[in-house]
Amino acid sequence: MSELLSRIGSPSDVRALPEEALPLLCQELREDIISICGRVGGHLGASLGAVELIVALHRVFHSPQDALLFDVGHQTYAHKLLTGRRDRMHTLRHAGGIAPFLDPRESPHDALLAGHSCTAVSAALGVLEGRRQQGHRGHVVAVLGDGGLTGGLTFEGLNNAGGSSLPLVVVLNDNQMSISANVGAIPALLRTREARDFFEGLGFTYLGPVDGHDLPALIRALREARASSRPVVVHALTLKGKGFPPAEADTQTRGHAMGPYEWRDGKLVRSRGGQRTFSEAFAAVLEDAMARDPRVVAVTPAMLEGSALNALKARFPDRVHDVGIAEQHAVTFSAGLASAGARPVCCIYSTFLQRAYDQIIHDVCLPGLPVVFAVDRAGLVGADGATHQGTYDVASLRPLPDLHLWSPMVGEDLAPMLDTALAAPHASVIRFPRGTLPPLPEGLGAGEAPLRGARWLLRAEQPRLTLVTLGPLGIAALEAARGEPGWSVLDARCASPLDEAALLEAGRSGHVVVAEEGTTRGGLGSAVLELFAAHGLMARVRLMGMPDAFVPHGDARVQRAEQGLDAEGLRRAGLALLAGGGR
């Protein structure tokens, strides 16, 4: 590899290069990104597609004096490489290493913490107005990409920005993809002559469409945008996965998230785990339910791939609805389906469900509609980090009246939970983690629908301590209790409503450890304490869960161990509680 990229320590070095050197810089950036993702994994496709665009941005604008705000962060590995982080990129997504997305605490060149989509325009307009009020100079650029024009927040920002007359620059990295192909009318409109009329009608000067891999054309368009005194949209057409044949050949996601892998002799070599994931297992039981009952439909906000729904979409094309990166719409659309007699299952990540909290309350729970929420990535998600942790769903959903909140311990729990939820006259949540399925403990049955309440995994004849768990932590609790006399293990299974009889029995053991992979503030442990207080039950209780902090990226297994949420940690907590001490 040439030494060109090794001489780039900041964007000023990009501006100092002769223009004829920029194509080589782009080539080296792609080689670095492919190599990095091969070693540690990551969001490959969007970053490869945005290489020329990011080089052109740093050629024309002067970061950090000019603020560059990227939507999501999927597309930003070249930006990281050009802003002084190349020597640490091998730590990408690892504990203590480079963040998976963008974070201003990592670099002054990251003007916006970006992990969720559709935030860049609103934030950029705020930055521009704030700078104007403070008398600060400098340009502000919002870079949209990976489906940013399928979400409502972007249009709220465009509406406000177009009416403001402020010189906001919006760069649309149009690769026709979010994770998979974009859906709906807007992405189709962008590839027509009406795109100009659309943006000009919103009050923007429209520049484009520009070939997003033609550096001279990009630089000309960005310089024109920089010189404008009013809002501008630069529309760049790019190819997600450009420069890496396996990504370009991947028609579903264009190499959205890949690695680790090896690229040898023109061939991609990847190790593939044979274990089934919770997502795949849930998709299978949902497929069975859809085959049995034509009223059952699936809804997802741009998560066909992530929630393992592609096979369902192929089998039931008219009953699987990908609505784009539009979580609020997904929930209210599901409410409408339910009100018309369908049985919608809204498949959504825990972290993205946060974006539709009002719709859950107002549009689903208040009218009492039987929507089922399949909440994927509940708990720790590992390398995707703080913006994607699923550690707040129990605490936020538990207070909602008549919403039943299920959490499977093993894959065998999914079918009876879904059957129970589909038969219920109210809303239900089935929350399951990222990762592979644990084995069903010996002698344990999953039960049959309708499920009712908690499940004893281990019941001591003379109990002196009970481990109460939610989800797969029951497996660790069983291991922790093995060989400990008088220890019981209760899988709460449903965080709301509680199985009061089982939990009060647990409390009468005198010592209770409640373990959950989520915040303890308002979570299952809080619910258990509320129950004990209401019944005047005096037990020693220890709550185990996430700290009062945002959990960063890292290995989820290590993070569980750090919080005592493995077998050894739970055993240690139980023994300390019995001894009357702390941790």
UniProtKB/Swiss-Prot annotation:
GO terms for biological process: 1-deoxy-D-xylulose 5-phosphate biosynthetic process; isopentenyl diphosphate biosynthetic process, methylerythritol 4-phosphate pathway; terpenoid biosynthetic process; thiamine biosynthetic process. Its cofactor is Mg(2+); thiamine diphosphate. One of its GO terms (molecular function) is thiamine pyrophosphate binding. Mg(2+) binds at residues 146, 175. It catalyses: D-glyceraldehyde 3-phosphate + pyruvate + H(+) = 1-deoxy-D-xylulose 5-phosphate + CO2. Binds 1 Mg(2+) ion per subunit. It comes from the Bacteria. Pfam families: DXP_synthase_N, Transket_pyr, Transketolase_C. Thiamine diphosphate binds at residues 74, 115-117, 147-148, 175, 244, 327. InterPro entries: Dxylulose-5-P_synthase (IPR005477), THDP-binding (IPR029061), Transketo_C/PFOR_II (IPR009014), Transketolase-like_Pyr-bd (IPR005475), Transketolase_C (IPR033248), Transketolase_CS (IPR049557). The keyword Magnesium applies. It is an enzyme of class 2 (transferase). CDD domains: TPP_DXS, TPP_PYR_DXS_TK_like. SMART domains: Transket_pyr (SM00861). Its EC number is 2.2.1.7. Keywords: Isoprene biosynthesis, Magnesium, Metal-binding, Thiamine biosynthesis, Thiamine pyrophosphate, Transferase. Coiled coil: none annotated. Pathway: Metabolic intermediate biosynthesis; 1-deoxy-D-xylulose 5-phosphate biosynthesis; 1-deoxy-D-xylulose 5-phosphate from D-glyceraldehyde 3-phosphate and pyruvate: step 1/1. One of its GO terms (cellular component) is cytosol. Belongs to the transketolase family. DXPS subfamily. Homodimer. Catalyzes the acyloin condensation reaction between C atoms 2 and 3 of pyruvate and glyceraldehyde 3-phosphate to yield 1-deoxy-D-xylulose-5-phosphate (DXP). This is 1-deoxy-D-xylulose-5-phosphate synthase. The lineage of its organism: Bacteria, Pseudomonadati, Myxococcota, Myxococcia, Myxococcales.
